[in-house]
């Protein structure tokens, strides 16, 4: 009997030990699974961090850039530092303009390209009496106003020359280097169209009665479409006619290659210009915008009641200035987009003699004062200078060319 109880106890002990062993093995197996799961979670987190880290770095960098841009846009300056100066310049007979990130310097006998350190990149000679330049992108034309000579050039130098049969009234150039000139032939005027090398593409004789006297000419970026503003008198009323010529395939079957034209009774259009893909006719009562690469159409007309005393523009903006009767608010400036939408209107009191768009900024000056506004109309700089200001325009980030009667300076606002 005793042996029987012993055997039963042994069996029970063995079952208990086996149960504990199975429980332990099960627990160990569960612990191993949890460990594997933990390893998977950690690996996923590491992968997520690897993805998020560069994204976070990029977002921080973008934020810093935007913050810096906003700071610089809102920052105003009250002084400037002269970085480079040249007192050997003949600023009386020499003129300056911006070309391809550098300075185009020209006079009656020479044209040269100068960098921002006032070092000459190249220089070439010609012979003119009254040189006037027009620049578009990397191309320029210099014409002898009331003379018969023109030179075509790009950032590398002169690409062609022309000797015209009649006196040059005005010359314009496109981004592709195509150029147009209005020539005065006495009873008739001519509008000639040239390649970058100076070769004649087309010539068009006009009559003062039909379509009128050409006031201005402008060229599209594609180098194919030419815009001309004519003026004539109809029944004692001054009338303007805007014509678009197409020298490509689209215009070959049209009379005189005119693909579209618009007449404005009682309106004077002294100035026209291409603004990127759009064109604008600056009128004495506002402006009209045209759109269309091959056959331009009227897009929008903005009319104003006040007398316009100044206009300025670039590819994205059109600016008008009006004179007010108030001593506290002498002038009103309105700036529109190239689609004709008003961006801002503001009063100002600076007695300027020149106002222009320069590298996305509005600059104005008189003989002793300079002023710079950003494209939102906020004043960036206003100050007086010693000496007589001859010219002033933007060269790049916070740098300007200041032409004085005593010499030429590259300045930085501070």
Task: Pin down the residues of each PLM region.
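Structured, soluble extracytoplasmic/luminal domains of envelope-associated proteins
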Residues: 121-175, 299-302, 309-335
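Solenoidal tandem-repeat scaffolds enriched in leucines and small polar residues
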Residues: 189-282
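Repeated scaffold domains used in trafficking and secretory/extracellular systems
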Residues: 88-98, 127-138, 166-177, 209-219, ...
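N-terminal targeting leaders characterized by basic, low-complexity, disordered sequences
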Residues: 1-32
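Short loop/turn segments that connect beta-strands within beta-propeller blades
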Residues: 115-117, 154-157, 194-199, 247-250, ...
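Structural motif
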Residues: 110-112, 148-152, 187-193, 234-246, ...
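Aromatic (tryptophan-biased) beta-strands that constitute blades/sheets of beta-rich domains
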Residues: 75-94, 115, 119-128, 158-164, ...
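Hydrophobic membrane-insertion alpha-helices, especially the h-region
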Residues: 53-70
């Amino acid at each position: 009997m005793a042996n029987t109880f012993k055997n039963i106890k042994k069996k029970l002990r063995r079952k208990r030990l086996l149960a504990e062993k199975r429980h332990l093995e099960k627990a160990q197996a569960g612990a191993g699974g949890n460990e594997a799961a933990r390893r998977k979670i950690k690996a996923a987190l590491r992968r997520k961090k690897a993805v998020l880290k560069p994204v976070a770095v990029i977002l921080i960098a973008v934020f810093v850039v935007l913050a810096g841009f906003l700071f610089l846009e809102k920052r105003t300056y009250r002084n400037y530092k002269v970085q480079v100066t040249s007192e050997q310049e003949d600023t009386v007979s020499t003129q300056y303009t911006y070309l391809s990130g550098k300075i185009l310097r020209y006079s009656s006998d020479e044209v040269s390209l100068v960098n921002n350190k006032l070092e000459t990149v190249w220089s070439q000679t010609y012979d003119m009496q009254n040189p006037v330049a027009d620049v578009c992108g990397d191309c320029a034309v210099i014409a002898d106003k009331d003379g018969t000579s023109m030179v075509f050039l790009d950032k590398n130098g002169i690409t062609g020359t022309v000797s015209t049969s009649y006196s040059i009234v005005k010359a314009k150039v496109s981004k592709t280097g195509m150029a147009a000139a209005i020539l005065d032939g006495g009873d008739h005027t001519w509008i000639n169209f040239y390649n970058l090398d100076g070769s004649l593409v087309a010539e068009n004789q006009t009559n003062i009665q039909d379509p009128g006297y050409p006031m201005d000419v402008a060229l599209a970026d594609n180098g194919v479409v030419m815009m001309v503003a004519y003026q004539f008198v109809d029944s004692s009323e001054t009338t303007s006619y805007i014509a678009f010529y197409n020298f490509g395939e689209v215009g070959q079957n049209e009379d005189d290659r005119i693909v579209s034209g618009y007449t404005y009774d009682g309106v004077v259009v002294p100035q026209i210009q291409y603004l990127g893909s759009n064109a604008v006719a600056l009128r004495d009562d506002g402006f009209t915008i045209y759109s269309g690469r091959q056959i331009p159409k009227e897009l929008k007309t903005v009319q104003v009641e006040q007398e316009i005393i100044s206009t300025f523009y670039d590819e994205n903006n059109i600016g008008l200035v009006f004179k007010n009767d108030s001593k506290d608010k002498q002038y009103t400036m309105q700036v529109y987009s190239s689609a004709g939408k008003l961006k801002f209107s503001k009063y100002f009191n600076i007695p300027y003699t020149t106002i222009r768009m320069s590298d996305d900024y509005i600059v104005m000056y008189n003989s002793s004062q300079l002023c710079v506004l950003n494209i939102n109309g906020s004043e960036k700089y206003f100050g007086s200078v010693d000496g007589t200001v001859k010219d002033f325009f933007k060269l790049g980030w916070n740098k300007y060319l200041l032409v004085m009667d005593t010499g030429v300076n590259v300045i930085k606002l501070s």
